[in-house]
Amino acid sequence: MIPVGCSFRISRHPCGYNKNVMELVQIDPARTIPAPKPEWLKARAPVGENYHDLKRLARSLNLHTVCESAHCPNIGECWQHKTATFMMLGNLCTRRCGFCAVPKGRPDAIDFDEPRRVAEAVAKLGLLHAVVTSVNRDDDLVGGARAFAMVIDEIRRQAPGCRVEVLIPDFQGNKEAIRTVVEARPEVLNHNTESVPRLYRVVRSGARYERTLELLRYAKELWPAGITKSGVMVGLGEETSELLEVFRDLAAVHCDILTIGQYLRPSRDHLPMARLYTPREFAELKTEALKMGFRHVESGPLVRSSYHAHEQAASTGLTVLT
C-alpha cells in the first residue's frame, strides 16, 4: 500500500542499466487533490426512479455492475437512462491495480448461471446495446472466457437485436481464451490499455503493455469485421508524447474506437492523481488521435470505457452483426 501523501516515480536506473526503477516520492496534496472541483468534473447525483429500478433489478438477480464496484462518476446519468455495465465472474479481482476501486481477494468458483441472469437483466431493461465486463480471474482463464462466450449467446437468445460489447481482461495472453470470446462474435471487443508503458508496473499490476497490444491485434485478425476498442486514463504522471505513442501503437493494430478520460482517485489508498487535464486538452488529444485513423474517439474528463458506448458504436456505422 502506498503511504498517504506519497506516490511512485519511475526513472532510469542511476547506473545506466536499460531498465526502469521505482522509488517513493513525496507528493504535494494541493496538486493531487484539487479543491474545489471544477464544474466540468461534476457529475449528476445518483437519484431518480430509473436509477433505483436498475439497482433493484441487479440485486434481485444477484448481479454486480462495474458502475458501483469501480465508483464510476457517471452512474447517476447512465442509470437514469437505463444503461449499465454488468460485471461478471464475481466481485473480487485477482489483481491489485493501483487505480482501481474494485475489491481484491480470492474469488469463489465461477458461477456459470450468471451469463443467463445478465441476459435476463438486459432483456428486462430493453437494451439495444449491452456492455459486459468482468474482474480478472487469473485462477481460471479459460473458464472466464467461456462465461463471456455464454453471456454473448444468452443475450442474443433473450434479447434479439441487442448489440453486445464486452470489456475483457487480458487472460494473461492465453490465445485459447481470447479465441473463445472472439468466436462468440461480440459486436464490440474492448480491452483497455489504461496507461503508458512507463507507468505499467505501478498502474496495472500483473499486466504487460505488449500483451495488451497483442490481444487487440489477435482479436482483429480472428474477426476483421468486429469492432475493437481500447481506453486510456490521463493524469497519472504521463507525458503527452507518451500518450501519442500509445495512440499510434493502438492505431497500428487497427483499433477502431479510443476512449480517453481523467483518472480520479477512488480513495486515499489508491494512486494519487498527478494533475487534471482541461476540456481543451482533451479536445486536443482527440484531434491528434483522429489524425491517426481511429473510427471514433471519445475524449473528456468524465469519459469511461462504456460511457456513451451505444453512440460510440453507432458512429462507426456498426449494425447488428451475427
Where are these regions (language model features)?
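Local cysteine-cluster metal-coordination motifs and their immediate loop/turn environment
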Residues: 66-77, 91-103
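Core AdoMet radical
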Residues: 101-117, 124-175, 181-215, 229, ...
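Conserved functional loop/turn residues at catalytic and ligand-binding sites
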Residues: 92, 96, 101, 126, ...
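Iron-sulfur (Fe-S) cluster-binding segments and ferredoxin-like electron-carrier domains
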Residues: 76-87, 99-113
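A secondary-structure boundary/capping signal
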Residues: 68, 88-89, 133, 167, ...
